[in-house]
Amino acid sequence: MITKNKTISKLKRLLFSLLLPAAITTAIPLQAQTCTSKLPCQLRIASYNIQHGVGMDQKLDYKRIADILEGISPDVVAVQEVDSMTRRTGNTYSLGEIADHMRYYASYAPAISFDGGKYGIGILSRKRPIRTEQHALPGREEARTLLVAEFDDYVFAATHLSLTEADLMASISIIENVAKKYDKPFIIAGDLNAQPDSPFIKKFQKSFHICNNKGKSWPADNPRECLDYIAVYKSYGDVRRPG
């Protein structure tokens, strides 16, 4: 399995918080900016790569992750690098453990079989989704997936994209075709494995408005690159940064 050796700390890891009312506000972690959008609801959204629940101290600690998330009180969270019933996590359902601590709903999408169990992505949500669906995405070095959860007022998708540029570019049309199916705001969040000036992000932004401020998010102990994003599908309405 090929993945970046991403780490988390007890008190600091990339956590986008995003408000989606008549305006969109993003903070990472203390900086802020505002965007405008025709959205019917107010949401706080986070994206968190948990590295199978193990922190920079090499300790598996689901409650620590839950505590960090509860500190920003998100409505919905995109979660990456999530184990389910693997030996290295003691045969636990990692997303369910975090959800239990937070009293949230857990939606899981395995991408590959690994270490006696599964490895993939998930969504934690304050409200129960109306429905969820999973879509395969290109991944030459490792299978990738898109998890979509529909709620009353919006649709939320979580993903962790490939490290390969060709796979990244091929993923855009798949994600866009999924977004087109819905007549409500479609929001996507996750680890896109691409920097803001990359060909992928430039093409991605033709269909999706990136709402976070593109602050550096990786590696956690000394962030040098922006790889994590929250974005809204543009076809729903006008989404722009004022000024």
Where are the regions that the model predicts?
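N-terminal, active-site-proximal structural segment of metallo-dependent hydrolase catalytic domains
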Residues: 2, 7-14, 28-101, 113-115, ...
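Bacterial N-terminal signal peptides
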Residues: 15-27
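Metal-dependent phosphoester-hydrolase catalytic domains
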Residues: 34-35, 134-135, 167, 177-187, ...
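Structured beta-strand-rich core segments of catalytic domains in phosphoester-bond hydrolases
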Residues: 35, 57-58, 82-154, 242-243
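Active-site-proximal beta-strand elements of phosphoester/diester hydrolases
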Residues: 42-54, 133, 148-162
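Active-site flanking residues adjacent to catalytic metal/cofactor-binding acidic residues
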Residues: 48, 80, 159, 189-191
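Catalytic metal-binding/acid-base residues of hydrolase active sites
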Residues: 51, 83, 162, 192-195
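Alpha-helical elements of Rossmann-like donor-binding domains used by nucleotide-donor carbohydrate transfer enzymes
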Residues: 63-68, 97, 148, 173-178, ...
